[in-house]
Amino acid sequence: MNENLFRPQFDTLKLSDKLWLMQTLATRYHLTFKELYAFSRWGQSCTTGLFEKGGREFVFVPGDTVILGWESFVQGMDKANQEELADIFAEIEYEGSAEEFLRQGMTPVRQVTIAPMFVGRKLEEIGWESVPMNDPRITAHPDWLENLQKWAGQNSQSFEIHETVRFERNGDSWRAWLCHPMTYPEFQRSLLWELAASLPTPDEWAYLCGGGCRTLFPWGDGLDHKMKLHHFENGEDQGKPYDMEQPNFFGLSIAYDPYKRELVDGKTLTTCGGDGGCNVCGGMGPLLGY
């Protein structure tokens, strides 16, 4: 494989050479090349190509040989994170160390080689189709709209009929989604047939999130409590973007909401990232929630 597609060489290419490489890849894989863009976040950076296909935006992520997994702190936690963990340990009567506790939920340390790839820049919700409120498939069910009016009168922000339809308040109006349930194998096949794409493996997902960093989070060994985080907003955060949802050093919006399980490739249904909100809903706080 072309060594220029791997990060050590890719990062040293002249912009003119990188531009030619990206245009060549776009032609080969039937993508529309948009531009070169420099992404920088949390001490890592990558100037790479942005592409488009079928209304989706993709980014080229160079490959690399990296260390994944976690077993111990590199920098150590600050006082705020230590105190948050100590309170939780006292509540659950845990007497071991923070590293021992966290290690239980981590994959083992290993060296892996990740191949270069095109990656969709944003998470996509599976099985839900965004539709206008006047879509015939919505208006054909006046009972849905009647129930929605009842919920709206109670100042509710959302209304969902299981595996059928979902409505969410959008300012003074509402947005609608229709549900199209599918199995994990069906989704994998649809990716292959419709996009000639696949889900990332768990190792690829970890690389896309952390780039091979050795700290607990991409920015360090503790949660930055100055960040605006989903499910832990306060009044001062109004109008600000969610920090972890902003593009990372590869230009990806990934692993930013503990309520969202992110599908990865496996023989059976496999997810990374969020736990469906179990820790957050269970009162474990932002650190263990994320």
Predicted regions and their residues:
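Extended beta-strand/loop cores of jelly-roll/beta-sandwich
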Residues: 1-198
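Functional-site microenvironments in short loops/helix caps that host divalent-cation chemistry
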Residues: 166-285
